[in-house]
Structures are given as structure tokens and as C-alpha cells.
């Protein structure tokens, strides 16, 4: 029982940590490509900015889904029988 709770805590930390790293890298790459594209074609900056913010929201949403799953495992763990 104690072993399962310890492994669940470790798994929650890994889910949140790797999700945060992935979201940060994804948003950084997307922001860099947005700057490159807006430097090449400044007339498309407003359209590209709208698409960039939509994609940033989707990337953050995927991370927050991972956080929600980690919180489910942390507080309402389906693997521990009470």
C-alpha cells in the first residue's frame, strides 16, 4: 500500500514535470517561428499572431489535461482500494 502511494506520487511529478517541459519547448519553438515568419512577411503579422495564440492555448490545454490527470491520481486514486 505504501509502495503504491509512493509510486503514484512519483508518477504525478513526472507527468507534471515532463508536460511542463514539453509545453515550454513547444511554445518557444512556435514563438521563434512566428518571429521568423513575421520578419519575412510583415503584412501577415496579424493573421499569424491570431494563429499563434490559438496554438499556444492548445499547447497549454494539453499540459493542463496532464495536470488534471495527475491530480486525479494524487487525490482520487483508482489503484488504491479503500
Swiss-Prot record:
How this chain sits in the membrane, per its record, is: Multi-pass membrane protein
Residue ranges of the TM segments:
7-27, 53-73
Q: Where in the chain is the site Reversibly protonated during proton transport?
A: 60
**CDD domains, alphabetized:** ATP-synt_Fo_c_ATPE
* HAMAP family (UniProt xref): ATP_synth_c_bact
Q: Subunit structure, briefly?
A: F-type ATPases have 2 components, F(1) - the catalytic core - and F(0) - the membrane proton channel. F(1) has five subunits: alpha(3), beta(3), gamma(1), delta(1), epsilon(1). F(0) has three main subunits: a(1), b(2) and c(10-14). The alpha and beta chains form an alternating ring which encloses part of the gamma chain. F(1) is attached to F(0) by a central stalk formed by the gamma and epsilon chains, while a peripheral stalk is formed by the delta and b chains.
Q: What does this protein do?
A: F(1)F(0) ATP synthase produces ATP from ADP in the presence of a proton or sodium gradient. F-type ATPases consist of two structural domains, F(1) containing the extramembraneous catalytic core and F(0) containing the membrane proton channel, linked together by a central stalk and a peripheral stalk. During catalysis, ATP synthesis in the catalytic domain of F(1) is coupled via a rotary mechanism of the central stalk subunits to proton translocation.
An example molecular function term from Gene Ontology annotations: proton-transporting ATP synthase activity, rotational mechanism
Q: Name one Pfam family in it.
A: ATP-synt_C
Q: Which domain of life is it from?
A: Bacteria
For this record, an example GO cellular component is: proton-transporting two-sector ATPase complex, proton-transporting domain
- Has keyword Membrane? yes
> What is the primary gene name for this protein?
atpE
Tell me which species this is from: Leptothrix cholodnii (strain ATCC 51168 / LMG 8142 / SP-6)
Protein known as? ATP synthase subunit c
InterPro entries the UniProt entry points to: ATP_synth_csu_bac/chlpt, ATP_synth_F0_csu, ATP_synth_F0_csu_DDCD_BS, ATP_synth_F0_csu_sf, ATPase_proteolipid_c-like_dom, F/V-ATP_Csub_sf
The UniProt keyword set, sorted, is: ATP synthesis, Cell inner membrane, Cell membrane, CF(0), Hydrogen ion transport, Ion transport, Lipid-binding, Membrane, Transmembrane, Transmembrane helix, Transport
Where is the protein situated, by its record's location annotation? Answer: Cell inner membrane
- NCBIfam families per record: ATP_synt_c, PRK06876.1
Tell me its family.
Belongs to the ATPase C chain family.
